[in-house]
Each structure stands twice: as structure tokens, then as C-alpha cells.
Design a protein with these regions (language model features):
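Alpha-helical transmembrane segments of multi-pass membrane proteins predominantly involved
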Residues: 1-205
């Protein structure tokens, strides 16, 4: 999953970004399913199924169709160059490892490594949202961040199923909100580039 997060930062084609995100979601569902099996926590199988169906299949397909329908520019425009973004990603990953491994000294090694991995994925998702101008790739960054949250949550023993379900549905709701937002930008500015808003704001001053 961490490799997929770096691949999302590196990739400069929207459809490839969607494919990588779908692969990350599938890996998440496998990880959660494995946790459910090894820890005898059957309710996590529902979480794994939700991750697989929603973020591994439904959401990527929906975004793909939305891109085709809107005629969105297929290249990903970045605020920062790929090289600098990857270096920032490595720095954030190192930071997450140092923080988690230092804070969770009393926990077992498997839990510590899992939490460090989850935090790194969360930070890389935030980095993707910051360094991308295209609204669609920012949606993917947000959902990649949420993948990290779910991965961290599965490591918390006794996490109520209702919380996991609410997290899954919050992603679906956020998708609809972002979709409406994208359609509005396209309708008003004939672009899904967030920079279009900055130009309009500058013209109104």
C-alpha cells in the first residue's frame, strides 16, 4: 500500500492514478481480511468487503466515467515537480516511522509497524491533495488518506463496526460532494483545474 501511495505521487496520467488507487483499495481489503482471519474478528470481513466494492470497484469506475463525460484533461498538473514531491514523501515516511516507533514502544512490533505504515499513507495522501491542481486527483488523494485511516483503525482492538461502516459511507458521501464540486467548476470555468478559481479570484480584485 505504501508503494501504491508513492506511485500515486509519481503518476502523471489520471486514468493511471485511478487504476493505482483501485489497486491500493484492493490491497487494503486484503490486509483487513487477513486481520479479520488471524485475529478472529469476523466483523472486519464486512469492512474488507466495503473497501473492495466501494473503493476498489465502484468509485474508480464512477470517476472514470465522470472524466470521460466531462472531457477532463488526462494529464495531471502538479504544483510541485515529481522529484521534489517524492523527496517530500520520503521525508514524511521517515517522520511517521520515527514518531510511531518512538511513541508505541510498549506495543508489539507488528502493531507498531502497521501504525507507522498507516500514518505514512495518511501523510502521503495529504501531500497528494496539496501538490495536485486537478480536482479529480485531489479526490483520489483524499480517499488514499482515508485508506490509511482504515488501516490504522483495524489495528485498534475492539473497534465498533458502526464506526467502520460510518467511515466507509463518509467516503461515499464525500465522493458525491466532490463530484458536484467538479461539475460546478466544469460548468462555470470550463475546467477542473483548481487554479481556475485563483484566476477568477484575482480578476475580481
Amino acid at each position: 500500500m505504501l508503494v501504491a501511495s508513492f506511485a500515486l505521487l509519481y503518476q502523471d496520467r489520471i486514468f493511471a492514478v485511478l487504476n493505482i488507487f483501485a489497486a491500493q483499495a484492493i490491497l487494503l481489503s486484503m490486509a483487513v481480511g487477513w486481520e479479520a482471519w488471524t485475529q478472529q474478528r469476523p466483523h472486519l470481513f464486512i469492512t474488507a468487503a466495503l473497501a473492495l466494492c466501494l473503493k476498489g470497484i465502484i468509485i474508480p469506475v464512477a470517476l472514470h466515467k465522470m472524466i470521460v463525460r466531462l472531457g477532463v484533461h488526462r494529464d495531471v498538473e502538479q504544483v510541485v515537480g515529481v522529484g521534489k514531491t517524492l523527496l517530500l514523501g520520503l521525508a514524511l515516511t521517515s517522520l511517521s516511522l520515527m514518531l510511531v516507533l518512538k511513541i508505541t514502544v510498549a506495543a508489539d512490533s507488528f502493531t507498531r509497524e502497521g501504525l507507522a505504515l498507516a500514518l505514512a499513507i495518511i501523510l502521503l495522501g495529504m501531500l497528494m491533495m496539496i501538490t495536485r491542481r486537478n480536482a479529480v486527483t485531489q479526490i483520489v488523494g483524499f480517499m488514499s488518506l482515508e485508506n490509511g485511516l482504515i488501516l490504522a483503525a483495524t489495528g485498534a482492538r475492539g473497534m465498533p463496526l458502526v464506526v467502520e461502516v460510518s467511515v466507509a459511507f463518509s467516503v461515499l458521501i464525500a465522493l458525491f460532494v466532490f463530484a458536484v464540486f467538479v461539475f460546478r467548476i466544469r460548468e462555470r470555468f470550463d475546467s477542473v483545474d483548481i487554479e481556475a478559481l485563483e484566476h477568477v479570484r484575482g480578476d475580481t480584485k
